[in-house]
Amino acid sequence: MLSKRIIPCLDVRAGKTTKGIKFQNNVEIGDPVEMAKFYYEAGADELVFYDITASHEQRGIMIDVVKKVAETIFIPFSVGGGISTLEGMRAVLLAGAEKVSVNSAAVKNPDIIRQGSRAFGNQCVVLGMDVKHVGEKPGIASGYEIVINGGRSYTGMDAIAWALKAQDLGAGEICLNSIDADGTKDGYEINLTRLVSDAVDIPVIASGGAGTPAHLAHVLDQGRADAALIASMVHFGTYTVNQIKGYLHDHGVKVRKTW
């Protein structure tokens, strides 16, 4: 059995790391390059960066961050936010990222997944999914709907159906974020994670809601996720990565030993 991955997530706004709750009320918490170095040395298995104010004007700032991170750490990291073209993917990968994440852009143009996987390999293409629980309704059989544009726009797309389509198009991994749970520290959305993990054959990263090591143990076991994204619980010093890994190890979850 492969080790479960623990992945700190850094949201970057205009070159600075921020954190909010349910995509709102973001506060600045540090320099992304310094934080990347800290988490690398602290035992993280990977890192995820999201350019949350992605725009043409800000793109150069994020590329500069990616280059500096690639020079500083020696674990895989992915970058997402505002990447909507093959050229955008190429720029991020050439700057040093191992993976590129597409979210809203893939909903609007699903073929970007196919293009990216053919050009760079499916291991480089991560589908980011922002999901809200809306209950069963026509077109949303699972009760979970894909939302885009930072959670502001409902798409009418069922989360499970979209995950399966993206897998068929060539996505190599899914980062599954529950907006309902995001930043709450009340635990991951277990049912959603299990539904998606059971539906697809590619790795699923659970995101949104981590507050305690027990939450990670639950989503990696009962949610059947391959990896867990963490943010608030480590950004604000409540736990260290190695404390989390130690807890998981003690509770029967296989992790890469870094403590």
Curated annotation (Swiss-Prot):
Q: Which superkingdom heads the taxonomic lineage of this protein's source?
A: Bacteria
Which keywords annotate this record?
Answer: Amino-acid biosynthesis, Cytoplasm, Histidine biosynthesis, Lyase
List the subcellular locations: Cytoplasm
Instruction: Tell me which residues this entry annotates as catalytic.
Output: D11, D130
InterPro entries attached to this UniProt entry: Aldolase_TIM (IPR013785), His_biosynth (IPR006062), HisF (IPR004651), IGPS_HisA/HisF (IPR050064), RibuloseP-bd_barrel (IPR011060)
Q: Under the cellular component aspect of Gene Ontology, which terms does the record hold?
A: cytoplasm
| EC number(s) stated in the UniProt entry for this protein | 4.3.2.10
Could you state a single Gene Ontology molecular function term?
Answer: lyase activity
The pathway is: Amino-acid biosynthesis; L-histidine biosynthesis; L-histidine from 5-phospho-alpha-D-ribose 1-diphosphate: step 5/9
Query: Is Lyase included in the keywords of this UniProt record?
Result: yes
Task: Cite the Gene3D superfamilies for this sequence.
Answer: Aldolase class I (3.20.20.70)
Q: Which Pfam families match?
A: His_biosynth
Catalytic activity field: 5-[(5-phospho-1-deoxy-D-ribulos-1-ylimino)methylamino]-1-(5-phospho-beta-D-ribosyl)imidazole-4-carboxamide + L-glutamine = D-erythro-1-(imidazol-4-yl)glycerol 3-phosphate + 5-amino-1-(5-phospho-beta-D-ribosyl)imidazole-4-carboxamide + L-glutamate + H(+)
Q: Which GO terms describe its biological process?
A: L-histidine biosynthetic process
- Protein's UniProt keywords contain Lyase: yes
Note the subunit structure: Heterodimer of HisH and HisF.
Q: Which family does it belong to?
A: Belongs to the HisA/HisF family.
What this chain does, per the entry, is described as:
IGPS catalyzes the conversion of PRFAR and glutamine to IGP, AICAR and glutamate. The HisF subunit catalyzes the cyclization activity that produces IGP and AICAR from PRFAR using the ammonia provided by the HisH subunit.
PANTHER family per record: IMIDAZOLE GLYCEROL PHOSPHATE SYNTHASE HISHF, IMIDAZOLE GLYCEROL PHOSPHATE SYNTHASE SUBUNIT HISF/H IGP SYNTHASE SUBUNIT HISF/H
- Name-wise, this protein is Imidazole glycerol phosphate synthase subunit HisF
UniProt lists the gene as: hisF
